[in-house]
Amino acid sequence: MTAVLMTALLVSAALPASAGTLPARTALERLQVKPASALVLARYERSKFMTGWRRDGAAGCDTRQRVLLRSDLSPGTGEECGGAEGRWYSPYDDRTLTDTAQLDVDHVVPLANAWISGAWRWSPARRHAFAHDLTRPELVAVSESVNVAKGGHSPANWRPPVRAYWCVYARDWITVKHHYRLSVTPREKSALRDMLGTC
């Protein structure tokens, strides 16, 4: 087992479980397949999901802070919502980072992709809950640069540069889409099957 894969597995162990109660391949086959709609995408606005990270809990930490706290590989700082420094592993591009300014919290299924996959029909409350979901494997700390490179792309057009992480990424993507009953495009489904082939 490579060092990259071992570190990725350590990080994923701290995150919500992938695939729920179904094997990923079974869950993938149950997803509705639909072509993407340019008309629906044209109506997408990030603000329909979130205008900032939600604060909740007794400590008042926001969602971003909670993701960084659970992903921090360094000893605790004693600060309830974490500090600006720590040690984070970005599994998409195999980088270890020590400054939160270098990090983004990625929506595994991007908000724009969720929108065209069915979230355009949801209530504002459901879209808000999706954007801040700490229960499913939807939020992961990664380097800012790799998150920018990913943008709103699905696996049909973007995959993590680290091939050893494809299996985890595909399972996470499928878990989120299956839970929220979001559709996939034919190319997206084909790409996910290919990525599951690395498991």
Enumerate the language-model features and the residues they cover:
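Short low-complexity stretches enriched in small and charged residues
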Residues: 21, 65-67, 98-100
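N-terminal carbohydrate-binding/catalytic regions of secreted carbohydrate-active enzymes
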Residues: 45-86
